[in-house]
Amino acid sequence: MSDTMSLSKSVLIEQAQSQMQALFEIPERSVPEKLALTCRILFDGGHDSGLAGQITARGEQEGTYFTQQLGLGFDEITSTNVLLVDEDLTVLKGYGMPNPANRFHSWVYRARPDVNCIIHTHPLHVAALSMLEVPLNVSHMDNCPLYEDC
C-alpha cells in the first residue's frame, strides 16, 4: 500500500508545493531579459514586427525605462539590444534610437508609480476590426470588460 494513502490532504498539498518549488524554480532574469522574452512572446502571439507597437519597462533610476530599438521587430529583440532611456528618450545605455512614440510612456510612468511595464501593440486582426467601424458583439466572458464600452 502507498505511504501517501494515510497522509492528510494538507500534508499532501504541502509536499506537492515543496516539490514544485524545488523542481520548477523560475530563474532570476534582468529587466532587459524579461523585456526581450516578452517581445518574443508577443511576436509568437501574432503581434507583428516593425512599427507595430512599443514595449517598455521601468528602469531602476527614477525617470528611466528600457525599450526596444526603433526598426527592430518583436522577433529581433534580445537583451543585448534593449535600450535604457530617460524621459527625453536620450539613450543612457545601449546603441540605437528608441521609437519616438515611446514619449507617452514617460507620462504614464510619471503619473502612475505603480506601473512597471507598458505594452502598446497594433495586432493585425484588431487593426482590421477597428477599420470596420462596427461595434463588437460581446458574446464571450473574456470580452465582458468591454460591455457597453465598444
Identify the residue ranges that each predicted region occupies:
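Glycine-rich flexible loops
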Residues: S2-C150
